[in-house]
């Protein structure tokens, strides 16, 4: 289960001082990742109606096929290997196991609806024992809505809880909000990159 907070930031906004976050003893070195995600749905938007996103993403430690379901407690993600490469102009074929996972809410054909490229810098926020409290990522996003032919760019931050996060994350997120606001950022108006890419 992914439990995270998203923020918006201007291009020149400096990063928050995450060493001031309760429970964080060390901010790790920056790790750069180039991510390229291609999102699919049915022609009638069955996945969106079920609050589910389907993507094929390259780059980063978790590249592959992802199905993300939005739940009250956070986002539940299921992953599969990438499989054969798909060129920019080639239709993407959804692997059988992925389609089977979605069978209760959507049936083929699936078509590409958005492409999101993301230049990401990630930082591990660890406690005094070296356990991961949270991961902070600084994302510079270029997104294309393939149905409307619209491209948008923005910068956003995400703070995702790790295994060493407190059982009640509310105080941690409240402290994170304060650090972000002090740095010049703001709580995101959009719940997901895909939603923002599609103008939601």
Where are these regions (language model features)?
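Phosphate-end processing signature that detects enzymes handling 5′-triphosphorylated RNA
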Residues: 1-200
